[in-house]
Swiss-Prot record:
<feature type="active site" description="Proton acceptor">
    <location>
        <position position="446"/>
    </location>
</feature>
<keyword id="KW-0021">Allosteric enzyme</keyword>
<dbReference type="GO" id="GO:0009263">
    <property type="term" value="P:deoxyribonucleotide biosynthetic process"/>
</dbReference>
<dbReference type="InterPro" id="IPR008926">
    <property type="entry name" value="RNR_R1-su_N"/>
</dbReference>
<feature type="compositionally biased region" description="Low complexity">
    <location>
        <begin position="796"/>
        <end position="811"/>
    </location>
</feature>
<feature type="domain" description="ATP-cone">
    <location>
        <begin position="16"/>
        <end position="110"/>
    </location>
</feature>
<feature type="site" description="Interacts with thioredoxin/glutaredoxin">
    <location>
        <position position="865"/>
    </location>
</feature>
<feature type="binding site">
    <location>
        <begin position="281"/>
        <end position="282"/>
    </location>
    <ligand>
        <name>dTTP</name>
    </ligand>
</feature>
<feature type="binding site">
    <location>
        <position position="450"/>
    </location>
    <ligand>
        <name>GDP</name>
    </ligand>
</feature>
<feature type="binding site">
    <location>
        <position position="75"/>
    </location>
    <ligand>
        <name>ATP</name>
    </ligand>
</feature>
<keyword id="KW-1015">Disulfide bond</keyword>
<feature type="binding site">
    <location>
        <position position="446"/>
    </location>
    <ligand>
        <name>GDP</name>
    </ligand>
</feature>
<comment type="similarity">
    <text>Belongs to the ribonucleoside diphosphate reductase large chain family.</text>
</comment>
<feature type="binding site">
    <location>
        <position position="274"/>
    </location>
    <ligand>
        <name>dTTP</name>
    </ligand>
</feature>
<feature type="compositionally biased region" description="Polar residues">
    <location>
        <begin position="812"/>
        <end position="831"/>
    </location>
</feature>
<dbReference type="Pfam" id="PF02867">
    <property type="entry name" value="Ribonuc_red_lgC"/>
</dbReference>
<feature type="region of interest" description="Disordered">
    <location>
        <begin position="789"/>
        <end position="854"/>
    </location>
</feature>
Length: 870
C-alpha cells in the first residue's frame, strides 16, 4: 500500500518489506493495510459496510506481496484486487478507484500552479532544450490567477471516477514528464477549461465546474491538446481530393498526414479519381485506378499516428457506387485475396444515391463510369444527380460496365458480413436535409459517419465535438417521496447544452489548424457537433425498457431539447458576434429547421415559433450545424456511461487494462438483483453461460428481464425507428451501428432498405455481429458449464468495440461460377440441413424477426435465395 500503511521501524529479519518512495525499507503491516482500506471505504459517500470487507481485501493484497515491493506497486495490487471483486458489488469498483486515485495524489503535486510551471519549464533530457507541455498563454494565465484557480479546484472529485474510467485517463489523457504522470484529473480539466476560454476566467471556471461534475465531456483531441503549444482541439476533418493528378493526390496525402499528426480523424472523398485503365493525357498512359493510390494512404495512416502514439491514425474513404472501381474498393479490407489489392488499415464507406437503391430494389441495370469520362456525378445530388446519371447511362459507349444493381449490392453485403464495412450513408438524404445545402453538394462524411459538412478543393471541413452525460439529468421526481420515482430534467439539460454550444464555438476561434484549408472552412461556416452518452443508462434509471413506448418518447424529447438549446445559444452568440459568413441563403435563414426537412412537427415543450422568428428576423445563427451524436468510445468509459445512444451489448463482459482483464457486471442490474436477494456467484455464472443475457434465467422477475434486454434482444426495427425519430432534431447525422447476431444477406438487405426508407442519413456505421463461438470464456462452475455458452468478446477499456472478423464459409460465399450472376437470383451454396439451421437461428433472433424477409425485390423464390431467405 502506501507509506502510512507500513511499519515505521525496519526489521532486517522480516520476511516481507516494502521500498518507500525515498528508497528506505519498511516492514509490511497487515493492520495498517486494513486501516488504510477502511479509511478509503469511509470517505463520502461511504461504501456499504455490509458488503465491502477491508480485511478480506487486505488478506488478498498481503498474499500477493513479495520482498522489496514498492509502495506504488502495493497500491496498484490493492486496487486491482478490489477491481477483481467488483462482481460482488459495484462498491468494490469504487474502492479500487479510490486506491488508484489516492496513489496518484501521492505521486503528484496538489498545486495546479506548480504542476503547470513544471510542465512549462520541462527540458527534454535528450536534447537539453526547453520542450514545454503547455502553452505560454496558459502558463501566464495560471501564474497571474493562480490563487483564484486553486480555490475552485476540487480534488475530491477525482474520487468520482470509477476504476476503469480512471485507468483510461491514466493511460492516455493525463500529461507525463519522462514517462511519469504529473497531472491529476482535476488539473487536466482546468487545463482544458483555460485552454478553451483563455483570459475569460469566469467562463473557464464555470466550464471546469461542469466538467468536474461529469455533466459533459469534450472530445478526446480537446482533452489531449487544449492548453498545449499546438492546441488542435478538433475531432473530425473531411477532405476532398484536390484534383485528379499527381500534384492533387500528393497534396491531399500531405494534408491527411498533417491532420493525423494533430490527432484528427479523417474522411476522404475519392469520387473524382479516375478509374483503372483510364487515359492519362500527360503521359499517354493509363491510370492504375483507386487501389494503388489507397494503399499509399493506408501506409500514411499507419505511419502518422494521432498525438504522438496516443491513437492510431484513422482515415475513412468515401466512394459513390457508380465509380468503375467500386468492386475493387469494397474488397480492400477483406482478409483474403491478393495482398496488392488490399489496404486493411483504412476504413471504407459508400456514398449511396437514391437511384442506386431504387435500381437494387427493382433488380434493374446499373452503369459504372469513370469520373474523368462522366463528369459531374459527384458534384450533384437528388434530382439533378438522377438526371445526369440517366443521361450518361443512355450515352452509347460511355458506361465502363453495365451490371445488375443487385450484383454490386450483394458484393457489398458480402464485405459487410466479413469485415463490418463498408459504412453506408445516403447521399441524397445527407444533402437534402442539411443546413449547408446552400454551399454546394456535400461529398462525404467523416471517420465515424456523424459529420455531414460541405468540402471543396479549397475547404477542408472541421468539427469540434462534445458529448452530454445524460444520466446526470435524471433526478428524483419532484413531489415524490419514493427514491425510485424519477424524472428527466429538461431545463437543466437545456442550460448545459447552451454552455457546451458556447464552448465549442469558442474552440473554432482558438483552435490550431494543421492546414490552412481547414481554418478557412471552419471560420466561414462555424459548425459544431454535440452528442450524447448514457441513453441506455437513463432508460434503466427511469425503469423504461429500451424498446418501450415511454423510452421512444423520451428519446425524441431529449433530442428536441438539445437541438432547441443549441439553436438558442447559437442565436444569442450571433446577436453578439454576428452570423457565420455563409448564413445567408441557408435553410435556417429562411426559417427552415431540421425537423421541417423531415416533415416532423415538434412538441409544445419549447417555443419553436419564437425561435424561428428570432433566427430569421433578429440575428440569425452563429453556427451552421450543431448536433452530431458520435460514438463516445473512450469518453463514455471515462465517465462510466454506456456508449452514445446504444443499448447494452451484454450485461456481463470483460474489460482489459494494462493490469489485466476484469469481469464487469452491469452495475445497475447487479444492484437490482442484490436488492431482490438473488445475486450470487451462481447467478453470475448463469449470466456468463447465457452470454450476458438474463432472459432465460429463472428467478429473475419479468420486469427486470424487459429492462435489461441486450441489443441482441431488441428488434433492429426499433433501433432504426428511434434513430429516425431523433434524426428530425439532428442537423448533421449519427454514428448508427447495426446489430445482427448472425447476418444473412436477406437480413442485411431488409435492414438497409428499412433505414433508407425511414430517411436516415447514416444507414450503417459498423455492422456488429456475434461470433458463433467467442474467443474468450469466463470460468464457470461445473454445474453451469455442462452446457457452456460462450460470452461476448472482450472490450478493451480504451478502444471501441471491434466488429468480429468473419471469413465467408459455404453458407455465405457467393459462387464464382460465370453463370451465377444477378440476371437470376444469387444463391447460397448451402445444404438443406444448413438452411434449416439458418431458419431456426433466424426465428431465435428477436431483434431481426420483423426484418428478416424483404419482399420488395424481384425474386423467383428459388431455394437458397439471398434476398428473401426462401
Amino acid at each position: 500500500m502506501i507509506s502510512n500503511s507500513i511499519n515505521v521501524t525496519p526489521n532486517k529479519e522480516s520476511k516481507m518489506y516494502v521500498v518507500k518512495r525515498d528508497g528506505t525499507k519498511e516492514n509490511v503491516s497487515f493492520d495498517k493495510i486494513t486501516s488504510r482500506i477502511s479509511f478509503l471505504c469511509e470517505m463520502e459517500p461511504k461504501l456499504n459496510s455490509d458488503i465491502v470487507d477491508p480485511i478480506e481485501v487486505a488478506q488478498k493484497v498481503v498474499s500477493g506481496v513479495f520482498p522489496g515491493v514498492k509502495t506504488t506497486e502495493l497500491d496498484n495490487l490493492a486496487a486491482e484486487t478490489a477491481a477483481y471483486m467488483s462482481t460482488r458489488h459495484p462498491d468494490y469498483g469504487i474502492l479500487a478507484a479510490r486506491i488508484s486515485v489516492s496513489n496518484l495524489h501521492k505521486q503528484t503535486s496538489k498545486s495546479f500552479v506548480e504542476t503547470v510551471k513544471k510542465q512549462y519549464e520541462f527540458i527534454n533530457p535528450k536534447s537539453n532544450l526547453l520542450a514545454p507541455l503547455v502553452s505560454k498563454e496558459l502558463y501566464e494565465i495560471v501564474m497571474k490567477h493562480g490563487e483564484r484557480l486553486e480555490s475552485v479546484i476540487d480534488y475530491y472529485r477525482d474520487f468520482d471516477y470509477d476504476f476503469f474510467g480512471f485507468k483510461t485517463l491514466e493511460r492516455s489523457y493525463l500529461h507525463r514528464i519522462n514517462g511519469k504522470i504529473v497531472e491529476r484529473p482535476q488539473h487536466m480539466l482546468m487545463r482544458v477549461s483555460i485552454g478553451i476560454h483563455g483570459e475569460d476566467l469566469e467562463s473557464a471556471i464555470n466550464t471546469y465546474k461542469r466538467l468536474s461534475e461529469k455533466l459533459f465531456t469534450h472530445a478526446t483531441p480537446t482533452l489531449f491538446n487544449a492548453g498545449t503549444p499546438s492546441p488542435q482541439m478538433s475531432s473530425c476533418f473531411l477532405v476532398q481530393m484536390k484534383e485528379d493528378s499527381i500534384d492533387g493526390i500528393y497534396d491531399t496525402l500531405k494534408q491527411c498526414a498533417l491532420i493525423s499528426k494533430s490527432a484528427g480523424g479523417i474522411g476522404i472523398a475519392v469520387h473524382k479519381i479516375r478509374a483503372a485503365q483510364s487515359y492519362i493525357r500527360g503521359t499517354n498512359g493509363t491510370s492504375n485506378g483507386l487501389v494503388p493510390m489507397l494503399r499509399v494512404f493506408n501506409d500514411t495512416a499507419r505511419y502518422v499516428d494521432q498525438g504522438g502514439g496516443k491513437r492510431k491514425g484513422a482515415f475513412a474513404v468515401y466512394l459513390e457506387p457508380w465509380h468503375a472501381d467500386v468492386f475493387e474498393f469494397i474488397d480492400l479490407k477483406k482478409n483474403t485475396g491478393k495482398e496488392e489489392m488490399r489496404a486493411r488499415d483504412l476504413f471504407y464507406a459508400l456514398w449511396v444515391s437514391d437511384i442506386f437503391m431504387e435500381r437494387v430494389e427493382q433488380n434493374g441495370d446499373w452503369a459504372l463510369f469513370c469520373p474523368n469520362e462522366a463528369p459531374g456525378l459527384a458534384e450533384t445530388h437528388s434530382e439533378e444527380h438522377r438526371a445526369l446519371y440517366l443521361k450518361y447511362e443512355a450515352t452509347p459507349d460511355l458506361p465502363r460496365r453495365v451490371i445488375k444493381a443487385q450484383e454490386l449490392w450483394f458484393a457489398i453485403m458480402e464485405s459487410q458480413v466479413e469485415t463490418g464495412t463498408p459504412f453506408i450513408l445516403y447521399k441524397d438524404a445527407c444533402n437534402a436535409k442539411s443546413n449547408q445545402k446552400n454551399l454546394g453538394t456535400i461529398s462525404s462524411s467523416n471517420l465515424c459517419t456523424e459529420i455531414i459538412q460541405y468540402t471543396s478543393p479549397d475547404e477542408i471541413a472541421v468539427c469540434n465535438l462534445a458529448s452530454i452525460a445524460l444520466p446526470k439529468f435524471v433526478r428524483q421526481k419532484v413531489g415524490s417521496t419514493d427514491p425510485k420515482e424519477k424524472e428527466f430534467d429538461h431545463q437543466f439539460l437545456f442550460e448545459i447544452t447552451k454552455l457546451i454550444t458556447v464552448n465549442l464555438n469558442v474552440i473554432i476561434d482558438r483552435n490550431y489548424y494543421p492546414v490552412a484549408e481547414a481554418k478557412t472552412s471552419n471560420l466561414r461556416h462555424r459548425p459544431i457537433g454535440i452528442g450524447i452518452q448514457g441513453l441506455a443508462d437513463v432508460f434503466i434509471k427511469m425503469r423504461m425498457p429500451f424498446d418501450s413506448v415511454a423510452a421512444a418518447k423520451l428519446n425524441v424529447e431529449i433530442a428536441e431539447t438539445i437541438y432547441f438549446a443549441a439553436l438558442t445559444a447559437s442565436h444569442e452568440l450571433a446577436i453578439r458576434d454576428g452570423t457565420y459568413e455563409s448564413f445567408k441563403g441557408s435553410p435556417a435563414s429562411k426559417g427552415i429547421l431540421q425537423f421541417d426537412m423531415w416533415n416532423v412537427t415538434p412538441s409544445s415543450r419549447w417555443n419553436w415559433a419564437e425561435l424561428k422568428d428570432n433566427i430569421v428576423n433578429k440575428g440569425g445563427l452563429r453556427n451552421s450545424l450543431l448536433i452530431a451524436p458520435m460514438p463516445t468510445a473512450s469518453t463514455s468509459q471515462i465517465l462510466g456511461n454506456n456508449e452514445c445512444f446504444e443499448p447494452y451489448t451484454s450485461n456481463i463482459y470483460s474489460r482489459r487494462v494494462l493490469a489485466g482483464e476484469f469481469t464487469i457486471v452491469n452495475k445497475q442490474l447487479l444492484e437490482d438483483l442484490m436488492e431482490l436477494g438473488i445475486w450470487s456467484p451462481e447467478m453470475k455464472n448463469q449470466i456468463v453461460a447465457a452470454r450476458g443475457s438474463i432472459q432465460s434465467i429463472g428467478g429473475i422477475p419479468d420486469d427486470l428481464k424487459e429492462l435489461y434486454k441486450t441489443v441482441w434482444e431488441i428488434r433492429q426495427r426499433t433501433l432504426i425507428d428511434m434513430a429516425a425519430d431523433r434524426g428530425a432534431f439532428i442537423d448533421q447525422s449519427q454514428s448508427f451501428n447495426v446489430f445482427i447476431a448472425e447476418p444473412t444477406f436477406a437480413k442485411l438487405t431488409s435492414m438497409h432498405f428499412y433505414s433508407w426508407k425511414k430517411g436516415l442519413k447514416t444507414g450503417m456505421y459498423y455492422l456488429r455481429t456475434r461470433p458463433a463461438a467467442d474467443a474468450i470464456q469466463f470460468t464457470v462452475d461445473p454445474i453451469v458449464s455442462q452446457t457452456p455458452k460462450p460470452v461476448e468478446n472482450n472490450i478493451n477499456s480504451t478502444t471501441p468495440l471491434k466488429t468480429p472478423t468473419k471469413t465467408p464459409n459455404s453458407s455465405n460465399r457467393i459462387s464464382t461460377s460465370p453463370t451465377n450472376n444477378l440476371t437470376s437470383p444469387i444463391r447460397f451454396n448451402i445444404t438443406q440441413q444448413q438452411q434449416q439451421q439458418q431458419q431456426q437461428q433466424q426465428q431465435q433472433n428477436n431483434n431481426e424477426d420483423d426484418l428478416a424477409n424483404y419482399d420488395g425485390m424481384t425474386c423467383r423464390r428459388e431455394e437458397g435465395c439471398l434476398v428473401c431467405g426462401s
